């Protein structure tokens, strides 16, 4: 009988948290991709998650793309991106732009900045930009 009570407590707690998770909405999380390669240089991006697949698109110098989404309980939210630039899009980098934590995040911002030397990240609008990835070169 004690095990049954513990089992019921766990089930009720789990479903109660699911309902509470949706009852109290929070600001959407954002992934920003910004082109700071230089004037006349185009940045190509392709980002996708488990539920969404953005088309391949280009950003001109000083343009940015904003992807807004909410974390989902049960499925870990993860956005992966491929950035390319250069002649024939020779330089590329593939990385995880956002991954949900163990608890839901509200209003998290991941600002990815593409520059000629590297790719930088600013978390939650806290400068300075921190180096994260280098560019790979295709043969």
Curated annotation (Swiss-Prot):
PANTHER family attached here?
PTHR31232, S-PROTEIN HOMOLOG-RELATED
Family, similarity comment? Belongs to the plant self-incompatibility (S1) protein family.
Where is the secretion signal located? 1-20
- Where does the UniProt annotation locate this protein? Secreted
Subcellular location, principal: secreted
- Return the protein name: S-protein homolog 14
Quote the InterPro entries the UniProt record gives: Self-incomp_S1
Which species is this record about? Arabidopsis thaliana
Q: Does the keyword Glycoprotein apply?
A: yes
Example GO BP? rejection of self pollen
Known glycosylation sites: 136
- GO annotations of cellular component type: extracellular region
Q: Keywords in UniProt for this one? A: Glycoprotein, Secreted, Self-incompatibility, Signal
């Amino acid at each position: 009988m004690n095990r049954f009570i513990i089992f019921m407590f766990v089930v009720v707690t789990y479903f109660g948290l699911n309902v509470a998770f949706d009852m109290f909405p929070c600001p959407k999380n954002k992934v920003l991709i910004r082109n700071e390669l230089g004037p006349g240089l185009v940045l190509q991006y392709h980002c996708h998650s488990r539920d969404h697949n953005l088309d391949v698109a280009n950003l001109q110098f000083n343009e940015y793309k904003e992807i807004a989404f909410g974390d989902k309980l049960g499925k870990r939210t993860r956005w992966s991106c491929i950035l390319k630039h250069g002649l024939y899009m020779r330089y590329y980098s593939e990385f995880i732009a956002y991954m949900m934590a163990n608890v839901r995040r509200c209003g998290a911002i991941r600002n990815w900045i593409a520059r000629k030397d590297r790719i930088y990240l600013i978390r939650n609008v806290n400068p300075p930009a921190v180096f994260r990835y280098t560019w790979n070169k295709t043969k």
